[in-house]
Amino acid sequence: MVHRPRLLCLHGGGASSQIMRIQFSKLESALRKTFQLVFLEGPLDSAPGPGVLPFFKDFGPYSCWVSDDRSLSPEEKRQEETNAIAYIKTFMLQYGPFAGILGFSQGARAAASILLEQQREAFTHDSLFGVFFCGTFPPFIPDAPDISLPTIHVLGLTDPYLRESEVLLEHCTQQSVRRVIKFNGGHHMPTSSDVTQQIADVISMTYRTSQRKRVSGIWKKNVVDSRPSALEI
């Protein structure tokens, strides 16, 4: 069987891995020959999120990565965020390798947090990139630097969270690959087959680019490591 690189998929707050699989069915079909999509369930129970009802009223229970409980103290909120990051990292280490992370809405915040963790202190040898669908802001890491790993941003032009998606884009450095796809729609996955195929093509291109850079980096490191030191004769 031909190995297909895995893409980790993180659903929105108040949804579920099952709901996300339905929402991403067109994209999964477009990527099927190239990638395997893996859908992870959020760690916390949740009420239904934006846009979930009434269509997914029979698809509970619902979950999230961090809660919207305003009664939590800053310390409790920070602990939720830390737990979410640890939960996702543990899954990735157990079921990886993963080539990239796809996140919808709150799932994009979670995906951005994992990219920032990988930047800060690599926890996996995977060469990661992120795809943010109708992403919200901020990540689960306070005072985070800009994301320098490759990212793809899918923005709905009538999404009520569009400004948050734009802020997330602004916090991804232009020095790396940073691609933007806009569609006529709100806080949901694009329904157009043309837009879906465009997203699939950009994901494939970003993966190929990241792999070339990874191989080039390994080759350069091996060349440097193979050079004699000043003490060798």
Curated annotation (Swiss-Prot):
Belongs to the LovG family. This is Esterase FUS5. Keywords: Hydrolase. GO terms for biological process: secondary metabolite biosynthetic process. Its EC number is 3.1.2.-. Esterase; part of the gene cluster that mediates the biosynthesis of the mycotoxin fusarin C. Within the cluster, FUS1, FUS2, FUS8 and FUS9 are sufficient for fusarin production. The other FUS cluster members are not essential for fusarin C biosynthesis. GO terms for cellular component: cytoplasm; nucleus. The keyword Hydrolase applies. GO terms for molecular function: hydrolase activity. The active site is at residues 105, 159, 187. Transmembrane segments: none annotated. It is an enzyme of class 3 (hydrolase).
